[in-house]
């Protein structure tokens, strides 16, 4: 008799996605981050749901409702910090996942890659709106500064900003709508993840060599379910260490001060996972130019497949490209550091050099390196 998992309409989908899925036998630990990105939103939705039960999206009570969650709700502090630090873990996994895609040439699966970029934008938007909800100083001023960037759009900019605010400044209407969007977006993200996986399973997974592995496939279960479980345990351990020992390590102390529109913090900065883009924004003295650079810092990912000039898919056997890739990683870490520094010498210059290097590596140096490597292959 045929196993029910192969005949039942619903179980059949799960079976083809998680159990009998033919998977390359040589995929490394870098492929674990895909499954970890399935775990992270589940944690966020679950903890977020419990937080939403106690949170009030009103400018007068938002800050005190978060305080109430931490002080009076049973394990409220744990739920809150799991949610906040869970977002940090989410972005760590996201950035490594994207980096792995660039390194091993996974961007040649165009549909999967493009849905991934849309997912990245959606997650960034969700995280930004979530940061506004506690209504601390950095929440308020972060929301004011970032939404104000839209005013750089010619003709419709100012109208657009006031439309998003629901008034003439960031106020009650803004907070309410941000809460509504922050609640609904994770479910839209979950739907997009399904589409992402649908396109991935059309082609099958890439592997470190970048060579088609149809002749060497193994079932996903038990091999990769066990491997992914190890990844889950490592991520949960890291998250719990962060939450239980230093929950405020990645936060901003200014956000423990209630929002005050009469008092601007000395250094307005977003959460650490946006600092690289924030540094690129600040490195351009022109407002519209800065906004375009900010958007392009992520949108440049969509151009990468068009600039693939190498005869090989993966960087596994391309030493020049490998060096450039790790320089790019170091550059992003430098930008992250600069984004958290005040706008003064020498940070301005370092930020500008790092921003130019970021775009140069992706748009000019990597395609050139690939062409040189193609020539070397003929020698």
UniProtKB/Swiss-Prot annotation:
Transmembrane segments: 33-53, 77-98, 113-133, 178-198, 226-246, 288-308, 320-340, 347-367
Molecular functions per Gene Ontology: metal ion binding; ubiquinol-cytochrome-c reductase activity
Location(s) in or outside the cell: Mitochondrion inner membrane
Entry keyword annotation includes Iron: yes
Top-level lineage group: Eukaryota
Cofactor annotation remark: Binds 2 heme b groups non-covalently.
Keywords: Electron transport, Heme, Iron, Membrane, Metal-binding, Mitochondrion, Mitochondrion inner membrane, Respiratory chain, Transmembrane, Transmembrane helix, Transport, Ubiquinone
Pfam families registered for this protein in UniProt: Cytochrom_B_C, Cytochrome_B
Binding site for heme b b566: 97, 196
Known cofactor(s): heme b
Membrane topology per record: Multi-pass membrane protein
Alphabetical list of InterPro entries matching this protein: Cyt_b/b6_C, Cyt_b/b6_C_sf, Cyt_b/b6_N, Cytb/b6-like_sf, Cytochrome_b, Cytochrome_b_C_euk/bac, Cytochrome_b_N_euk/bac, Di-haem_cyt_TM
Main location: mitochondrion
Positions that bind heme b b562: 83, 182
GO biological process: mitochondrial electron transport, ubiquinol to cytochrome c
One Gene Ontology term, aspect cellular component: mitochondrial inner membrane
Binding site for a ubiquinone: 201
Family: Belongs to the cytochrome b family.
Subunit structure and binding partners: The cytochrome bc1 complex contains 11 subunits: 3 respiratory subunits (MT-CYB, CYC1 and UQCRFS1), 2 core proteins (UQCRC1 and UQCRC2) and 6 low-molecular weight proteins (UQCRH/QCR6, UQCRB/QCR7, UQCRQ/QCR8, UQCR10/QCR9, UQCR11/QCR10 and a cleavage product of UQCRFS1). This cytochrome bc1 complex then forms a dimer.
Function: Component of the ubiquinol-cytochrome c reductase complex (complex III or cytochrome b-c1 complex) that is part of the mitochondrial respiratory chain. The b-c1 complex mediates electron transfer from ubiquinol to cytochrome c. Contributes to the generation of a proton gradient across the mitochondrial membrane that is then used for ATP synthesis.
Further information: Heme 1 (or BL or b562) is low-potential and absorbs at about 562 nm, and heme 2 (or BH or b566) is high-potential and absorbs at about 566 nm.
Protein name according to UniProt: Cytochrome b
Gene name of the record: MT-CYB
